[in-house]
Design a protein with these regions (language model features):
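Active-site anion-handling motifs in enzyme catalytic cores
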Residues: 1-280
Length: 280
C-alpha cells in the first residue's frame, strides 16, 4: 500500500522498449551529474569517477559521441534532447530516477537498493524481456529470480584505460581509511603514506548551478594523481579500488563492515577485501 501512489506510466520507460539505432538519435548521450542537498558541504568524488569511466567507454566505441549532463535522481523530469544513457550507478532513494520517454536507458553496471526491489515487486513487473548488467551479486540474484536476462557486468570504472609506467609512480596512498585501520598498518607504510579523502571533498566555490563541474574536475584530478604518482593504493572505497585496478595500480581493499560485503562483490574474483581481523 505504501507504494501504490507511485504506480504510473513513468515506469514504462524503465527498459521495456526497443533500443533505437544510434543514428536515430544522432549519437547523443546523457551522462550523470549529481545535485547534492544544499546543506551538505562535502561531496563524494566516486560519483563523478563513475561518470568519467562511462564517458571514456562511450568514446571508445563512438568517436562522434555528443554528451550532455543531467541529474541522476530526476530522469522522470528529463526535458532535453532524446539521448542514450548508460545507467551505471546506485539506484535509488526514490523512483524519480526512472527515465521518461526521452531517455533510452542501457542498464550496465547497475545496482538496485532493496527499497527499489520492493517497489518493483509491488508493481509486479514482468522482467522476462529485460536485459540488465548488474554491478553486484545481490542485484544479479534479484533479476535472475525475476527471469530477466541478467548478467554480471561489474562496475564500469574497471574499464578505464591502463596507465603508462613511470619512475615517478612511487607514492603510497591511503584513501578513506579511518584511524583504527591506519593504526594497524605496518610502520614503514604509515611513515611513507599520503592520506587522501575522496568521499568528502569540500567545494571551494559554493554555487549550486555549477558546482557539479567543479566536482567533475576534482574527480579528473584525483584519477590523474593516482595514475601518475601511485605505486600502491590502500582503500576502503569501491570507486577508488576499481578505477585503480583498471589503471594498473596495485590495490589493497579494506572492508570496514560486513555491510560492504555485497558492495565489494563487484570485485569478486579480481580483488579480495581484507577485514580488521586480517590486519590484526
Amino acid at each position: 500500500k505504501k507504494y501504490s501512489h507511485l504506480i504510473n506510466k513513468k515506469f514504462s520507460s524503465f527498459g521495456m522498449k526497443k533500443y533505437p539505432r544510434r543514428e536515430e538519435i544522432g549519437g547523443d548521450y546523457c551522462l550523470f551529474k549529481y545535485l547534492y542537498i544544499p546543506g551538505i558541504k562535502a561531496y563524494n568524488l566516486g560519483d563523478y569517477i563513475q561518470t568519467i569511466a562511462t564517458r571514456s567507454l562511450i568514446e571508445l566505441i563512438d568517436k562522434n559521441a555528443k554528451f550532455h549532463f543531467y541529474n541522476r535522481d530526476s530522469f522522470s523530469l528529463y526535458n532535453k534532447k532524446e539521448s542514450i544513457c548508460i545507467m551505471q550507478g546506485w539506484f535509488a532513494d526514490d523512483y524519480n530516477f526512472l527515465p521518461n520517454e526521452r531517455i533510452f536507458p542501457v542498464y550496465i553496471g547497475t545496482h538496485f537498493t532493496k527499497k527499489m526491489q520492493e517497489y518493483f515487486d509491488v508493481l509486479n513487473v514482468d522482467f522476462k524481456d529485460f536485459e540488465i548488467g548488474c554491478r553486484d551479486l545481490s542485484t544479479l540474484d534479484y533479476f535472475n529470480k525475476k527471469g530477466a536476462n541478467a548478467y554480471f557486468s561489474r562496475c564500469l570504472t574497471l574499464t578505464l584505460p591502463k596507465r603508462e609506467v613511470s619512475a615517478k609512480q612511487n607514492s603510497i596512498f591511503l584513501v578513506n581509511l579511518n584511524h583504527e585501520m591506519s593504526s594497524l598498518l605496518p610502520d614503514f607504510i604509515k611513515k611513507e603514506a599520503i592520506e587522501i579523502n575522496q568521499k568528502a571533498i569540500k567545494i571551494k566555490n559554493r554555487n549550486l548551478k555549477n558546482e557539479w563541474q567543479e566536482c567533475y574536475k576534482e574527480a579528473q584530478d584525483i584519477l590523474e594523481k593516482y595514475a601518475s604518482e601511485a605505486k600502491l593504493v590502500i582503500t576502503t572505497a569501491l570507486h577508488c579500488a576499481a578505477p585503480c585496478i583498471a589503471l594498473g595500480i596495485p590495490v589493497i581493499l579494506l572492508q570496514e563492515d560486513k555491510v560492504y560485503e555485497d558492495r565489494f562483490s563487484a570485485l569478486k574474483g579480481i580483488l579480495k577485501p581484507y577485514t580488521f581481523n586480517d590486519l590484526k
